Regions:
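Short acidic/glycine-enriched loop/turn segments that link adjacent beta-strands
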Residues: 92-95
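Ribokinase/PfkB-type carbohydrate-kinase core domain
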Residues: 1-13, 59, 63, 71-89, ...
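Glycine-rich phosphate/adenosyl-contacting loop at the front of the ribokinase-like
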Residues: 1-63, 68-72
C-alpha cells in the first residue's frame, strides 16, 4: 500500500474578482464588463487545491483576514479537504485580486495583498513541523520574500 504524500503550501489566499471585457479600458475610461465572477484564488491556494484534487494530503499555511470573505474561504479549504490549522486569521482584510480578461484571454491583475502580507517568519515557526513532515513544500512569491526564504530553509 502506498502512503499519500503530505504536501505543505506556504502562500497566498485571495478572493478573485474576474471581469470579462471586450477590450481593456483606456486610462480614465469606464468600460462595461461582459460578465463577472468571484472565486477563491491566490497562487498558494490554487496550488493547494490542485494538489488536494490530485490526491495529496495538503496542509495550507498562510493568513486570512478577520472578515466574511476569510470565513467563507476557510470553509472552502475544508470543503476541498485541505488541512487549514496553519492558516491564521489576522486583523486585516483577506487578500483580493481584481482580474480583467479580454476576448483573446489576455489579462491584467491588480492585487491587494491584505492578510497575505501579515505572514511573518516568526509566525511560520509555529508551522515548522508541518513543513518538516512534508514530502514537498510548495512556495510562490505572493507572500513577503522573507517568509518564502524562511520556508525554503525548513
Amino acid at each position: 500500500m502506498t502512503s499519500v504524500p503530505v504536501i505543505s503550501v506556504v502562500g497566498s489566499l485571495n478572493v478573485d474578482h474576474t471581469f470579462r471585457v471586450s477590450r481593456f479600458p483606456e486610462p480614465g475610461e469606464t468600460l462595461t464588463a461582459l460578465g463577472a465572477e468571484m472565486s477563491f484564488g491566490g497562487k498558494g491556494a490554487n496550488q493547494a487545491v490542485a494538489a488536494a484534487r490530485a490526491g495529496g494530503k495538503v496542509r495550507m499555511i498562510g493568513c486570512l483576514g478577520n472578515d466574511e470573505r476569510g470565513r467563507e474561504y476557510r470553509a472552502r479549504l475544508e470543503a476541498e479537504g485541505i488541512e487549514d490549522s496553519g492558516v491564521l486569521t489576522v486583523g486585516t482584510s483577506t487578500g483580493a485580486a481584481f482580474i480583467t480578461v479580454d476576448r483573446k484571454g489576455e489579462n491584467t491583475i491588480v492585487v491587494d495583498s491584505g492578510a497575505n502580507h501579515a505572514l511573518t517568519p516568526k509566525m511560520l515557526e509555529d508551522s515548522a513541523f508541518r513543513i518538516e513532515e512534508s514530502a514537498v513544500t510548495l512556495l510562490q512569491l505572493e507572500c513577503p520574500p522573507e517568509v518564502v526564504e524562511a520556508a525554503a530553509g525548513l
